[in-house]
């Protein structure tokens, strides 16, 4: 008799498929991101208004390091973390001064209260929702009291593995507004902003959230 598979097995497989997709497409991803005119996303700009000028920041799912480099150039102390080796290698070659760490987002290797702010642009959406909920609670422990978290996730009803597009094979968890709000609050955050927006560059509707750790 074959051993029973737990729900964790299937969610892990979705994460691994997404990582593999980025490993295969890393060069294309970095080239595409680097060609874009780098305009600071409005959510990022808003998040930074709440943070001190010398804040210690973690870029969660940093990919090739473009956002981390933007923050580093503006004087923040930045660490980027991602699971995809090829993206990190490209980032280290392009941005030699950056601290880029390879780690699974579901098991981050940082000490409690190590950061003032956490930035997660289009990264939590690649985790199945049970994993994302656990990560939200873990992230709350990584920031100091009063620390800020900002994230973008895909909006909608259906989560699915996308087999087409410019990086085929990625999993996308789509969230409803009230569903994400509940998950963020239950993880210990106080929501400052949570809005559904249309992103013309990435196409489609997204949820932007900024939240603060109490205490």
Predicted features and spans:
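Conserved class I S-adenosyl-L-methionine
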Residues: 2-52, 157
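Class I SAM-dependent methyltransferase SAM/SAH-binding core
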Residues: 58, 64-107
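A short acidic, Gly/Pro-enriched loop at the edge of an enzyme's catalytic core
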Residues: 106-118
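A short glycine-rich, Lys/Arg-flanked "PGG" loop and its adjoining helix->strand segment in the class I
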Residues: 133-145
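Conserved beta-strand signature within the Rossmann-like core of class I S-adenosyl-L-methionine
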Residues: 146-153
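Short, glycine-/aromatic-enriched active-site segment of Class I SAM-dependent methyltransferases
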Residues: 154-171
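Short alpha-helix
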Residues: 172-187
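Conserved S-adenosyl-L-methionine
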Residues: 189-200
């Amino acid at each position: 008799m074959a051993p029973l598979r737990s729900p964790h097995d299937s969610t892990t497989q979705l994460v691994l498929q997404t990582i593999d997709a980025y490993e295969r497409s890393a060069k294309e991803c970095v080239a595409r991101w680097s060609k874009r005119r780098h305009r600071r996303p409005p959510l990022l700009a808003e998040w930074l208004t709440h943070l001190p000028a010398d804040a210690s920041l973690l870029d969660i799912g940093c990919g090739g390091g473009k956002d981390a480099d933007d923050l580093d150039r503006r004087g923040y102390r930045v660490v980027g973390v991602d699971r995809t080796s090829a993206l990190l290698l490209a980032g280290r070659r392009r941005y030699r001064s950056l601290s880029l760490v390879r780690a699974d987002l579901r098991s981050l290797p940082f000490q409690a209260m190590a950061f003032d702010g956490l930035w997660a642009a289009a990264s939590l959406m690649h985790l199945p929702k049970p994993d994302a909920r656990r990560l939200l609670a873990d992230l709350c422990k990584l920031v100091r009291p009063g620390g800020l978290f900002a994230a973008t996730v895909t909006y909608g009803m259906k989560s699915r593995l996308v087999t087409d597009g410019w990086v085929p094979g990625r999993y996308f968890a789509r969230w409803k507004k009230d569903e994400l709000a509940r998950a963020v609050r239950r993880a210990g955050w106080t929501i400052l902003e949570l809005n559904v927006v249309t992103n013309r560059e990435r196409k489609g509707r997204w949820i932007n959230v900024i939240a603060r750790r109490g205490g």
